[in-house]
UniProtKB/Swiss-Prot annotation:
GO terms for molecular function: metal ion binding; monooxygenase activity. It catalyses: 3-(N-acetyl-N-hydroxy)aminopropylphosphonate + 2-oxoglutarate + O2 = (R)-(3-(acetylhydroxyamino)-2-hydroxypropyl)phosphonate + succinate + CO2. Keywords: Antibiotic biosynthesis, Iron, Metal-binding, Monooxygenase, Oxidoreductase. Fe(2+) binds at residues 150, 152, 288. This is FR-33289 synthase. Binds 1 Fe(2+) ion per subunit. The gene is frbJ. It comes from the Bacteria. It comes from Streptomyces rubellomurinus (strain ATCC 31215). The lineage of its organism: Bacteria, Bacillati, Actinomycetota, Actinomycetes, Kitasatosporales.
């Protein structure tokens, strides 16, 4: 039987904008020595022809930088659920070299998991020019349009900025725990729907023999902890359509209500990433959205907005119901990968 939390969540993961607006509380800056550690580790991996994902943090020690990354994890898991690691060395590196740098940092965050049906553990967030979210196969990281409130599948989503667009692309984060407390006050009759979950579209990346959409809960309560997973609304809209039925109006109301609370100006903090910034969010306790962005007028690839993303599970992370964790441990190989 599903256990529904009927009292407010407490702790640092419950916040509004005024409490986190001072970014120095959750910003961690790599100094030159730390940057050198990371670069040297990445260079060793490249020189030896190794794949960073075949290694673990013991094989890639970061004496000083590793301690700062550990502080980020502490902030994510036991603090506000967001952190900024500033000064990640990417200047002058190729995209492939930057992926290794991100992988080195990722090893000290936790375990990277697959983000698509190809099994990619690092994906490029940029405009692929393949279409928009109303397409049946496009994922959010492949388009430059705005992305509504959502969380990703693992414990931590890490975004490393390589180049930024001239216009737009702002990043907004809200506390899912504060949203829950507001729902308790304003719409308690909807709570059961969030625990039951809705259907989300695989976007053509369903494993062999599985339907094109899957049910995932939005909130789950387990071992005294509330956790959240709120995937893209576009995927909920197209998921039910692919299964051959229309989404019930009460489910639409529940999703509308969740997003309206997150969108209140006092309930979220906004930021813009610059090259070398790694934004970290804890998907268990936060949701985020992205503004639309436009690239350089000349359209050259080198000047286009380009971020790298990792999905990370932390060591000894929290446990929660399987209804909430469809892709927590990574996406399975797709029958027909589309990306």
């Amino acid at each position: 039987m599903v256990e529904i939390l009927k009292k407010p969540v407490t702790g640092r993961s419950v916040w509004q904008r005024a409490q986190v607006e001072d970014a120095s509380q959750w910003t961690y800056v790599l100094d030159e020595g730390m940057r050198a550690e990371i670069l040297e580790a990445a260079e060793r991996i490249n020189e030896q022809g190794l794949t960073v994902w075949d290694l673990d943090r013991k094989a890639v020690p970061l004496e000083r930088a590793g301690k700062l990354v550990a502080q980020c994890v502490e902030q994510l898991e036991h603090g506000f659920g967001l952190a900024m690691l500033r000064g990640v060395p990417t200047e002058g590196l190729t995209v492939a070299e930057s992926q290794v740098v991100m992988g080195v940092v990722g090893l000290h965050l936790g375990t990277a998991v697959a983000q698509n049906g190809h099994g990619d553990r690092v994906v490029s967030i940029r405009d692929y020019g393949k279409g928009r979210l109303n397409s049946k196969t496009i994922r959010g990281y492949q388009t430059n349009e705005s992305l509504p409130w959502h969380s990703d599948a693992p414990d931590i989503a890490a975004l490393l900025c390589l180049t930024q667009a001239k216009h737009g692309g702002e990043f907004h984060v809200a506390s899912a725990m504060h949203i829950y407390n507001t729902l308790l006050q304003e719409a308690p009759e909807l709570l059961g729907l969030y625990y039951a979950g809705v259907f989300f579209d695989y976007r053509g990346e369903e494993p062999p023999g599985e339907p094109p959409a899957y049910r995932n809960a939005i909130f789950g309560y387990h071992n005294g902890q509330l956790s959240c997973r709120y995937f893209l609304r576009n995927f909920a809209d197209s998921g039910t359509a692919k299964l051959g039925f229309e989404q019930p109006e009460v489910e639409k109301l529940a999703l509308d209500t969740f997003e309206e609370i997150a969108s209140r100006p006092e309930n979220h903090v906004s930021m813009r990433l610059e090259p070398g910034d790694m934004q970290l969010v804890d998907d268990n306790v936060t949701v985020h959205r992205r503004g639309a962005y436009s690239d350089e007028e000349d359209g050259s690839t080198d000047s286009s907005r380009h971020l790298l993303r990792l999905w990370i599970n932390v060591e000894n992370g929290r446990q929660f119901p399987t209804s909430l964790s469809t892709h927590r441990w990574g996406m399975k190989a797709a029958a027909k990968p589309t990306h």
